[in-house]
Amino acid sequence: MDIGLREWLIVIGLIVIAGILFDGWRRMRGGKGKLKFKLDRSFANLPDDDGDSAELLGPARVVEHREPSFDEQDLPSVSARETKERKGGKRQEEPRQGDLDLDEGLALEADPSDAAEPVEPRKGKSKGRKEKEREKAPAVAAEPAPVDEVLIINVIARDESGFKGPALLQNILESGLRFGDMDIFHRHESMAGNGEILFSMANAVKPGTFDLDDIDNFSTRAVSFFLGLPGPRHPKQAFDVMVAAARKLAHELNGELKDEQRSVLTAQTIEHYRQRIIDHERRSLMQKR
């Protein structure tokens, strides 16, 4: 069979292509082998002291080896093993220095039972102190000062539907009242709800409380602001804050201010309330004398 020039060129081209593919495949395999070899050499450079997992802490030893760079002697001779041995020596010496217990972790490693013993009496003492404070606290709370007078300002809704819960809640929160004891709202010295109670606000409709869980469906025809005497340290200032909160509620939610007799609250009635506060303070001073 005669083979022409065309057939020879095809055969030679196939051989060249096969050679190129084989050479590329060989180089790729050779490259992978070199990469693995380099990785293995990087791990082979680690110290051969121990075969434990602690040897993986190479970065920590490098940092510790650089820290003594301020020393003037034996910098090249410092090795990771020597620094580790020095640290181990310090850990063995510290528990022997006495009952200082400067390091709680070292004390636990030396003897866990000894370290647990001094902790228990401290807890017992703290519990005993807390129990004593709790015993004293109810004794103080169980003897509230008797209230001689109560100043009341009622806010009655003009709309038959009354004050809606969400709008009422938003209004009184802006005035600094916070939900608290007896399921009613209280105004403290701080707007955040801290300090003594200046005055309170209750629901004027039975049962006289508020249900925050159902505030979206809540409504009432009237609310009552009240301030007891004796009460806050500065009753006149507290009364002014109460009047401002009641006026804000009546103005924004279409309410009407009433006194304790459900009569219209006039400027003269407010001055009468202030005079009652002054008279009460005067009587209190007379009794103290």
Swiss-Prot record:
Residues 100-114 have a biased composition (Acidic residues). Coiled coil: none annotated. The chain crosses the membrane at residues 2-22. The keyword Cell cycle applies. Residues 81-99 have a biased composition (Basic and acidic residues). Residues 1 are periplasmic. Residues 65-141 are annotated as: Disordered. One of its GO terms (biological process) is division septum assembly. Keywords: Cell cycle, Cell division, Cell inner membrane, Cell membrane, Membrane, Transmembrane, Transmembrane helix. Belongs to the ZipA family. PANTHER family: CELL DIVISION PROTEIN ZIPA. Interacts with FtsZ via their C-terminal domains. This is Cell division protein ZipA. The gene is zipA.
